[in-house]
A protein has these predicted regions:
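Short, charge-rich amphipathic alpha-helices with coiled-coil/heptad character
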Residues: 1-30
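Long amphipathic alpha-helical coiled-coil segments
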Residues: 32, 36-39, 43, 84-120
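Extended alpha-helical coiled-coil "stalk/arm" regions
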Residues: 32-74
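Short, glycine/alanine-rich amphipathic alpha-helical segment
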Residues: 60-95
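C-terminal alpha-helix/helix-terminus motif
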Residues: 121-124, 128
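Short acidic DE-rich linear segments
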Residues: 129-136
Length: 136
């Protein structure tokens, strides 16, 4: 049985698109996991910083002026880190949304390519069946 060149080419194009989108989906999923992991690590780091830099009167009361100054400087550093954390968190949220969108788009394209491949196979099988019936 010979497959018509048009069907064969269409199948190969759909197969290549499927493979390409499968790779794109895998990359998007990997990037998504990476961003989410970094977000969790940053949240944990911020919890630690917040715990070390509390400026409650109880904490400050037992310290001499040098210790209080150091504690205030640490709190200022923590405040800067906290601002950076929230900016990074917003950037990470945008990246998460981007990678989720890219993964969904790749999955949609994979599904379309799969339908084209299935259609090509069905068409070839149908033609083979029709050809076999007319020969018999």
């Amino acid at each position: 049985m010979s497959i018509q060149p048009g069907i064969n080419e269409t199948f190969k194009e759909a197969e290549a698109l499927y493979t390409e989108q499968s790779n794109a989906w895998a990359l998007a999923a990997e990037n998504l996991r990476d961003v989410q992991s970094r977000m969790r690590a940053a949240e944990y780091e911020m919890e630690l910083i917040e715990g070390f830099t509390r400026l409650s009167p109880e904490v400050m009361a037992g310290k001499n002026s040098e210790e209080r100054s150091a504690q205030v400087l640490l709190a200022v550093d923590a405040d800067v880190a906290y601002s950076a954390f929230w900016q990074e968190r917003e950037t990470s949220r945008q990246l998460v949304a981007r990678w989720q969108d890219e993964a969904m788009l790749a999955r949609d394209k994979m599904a379309k390519a799969k339908r084209v491949m299935d259609y090509c196979i069905a068409l070839v099988n149908w033609r083979a069946t029709k050809g076999g019936e007319s020969d018999g």
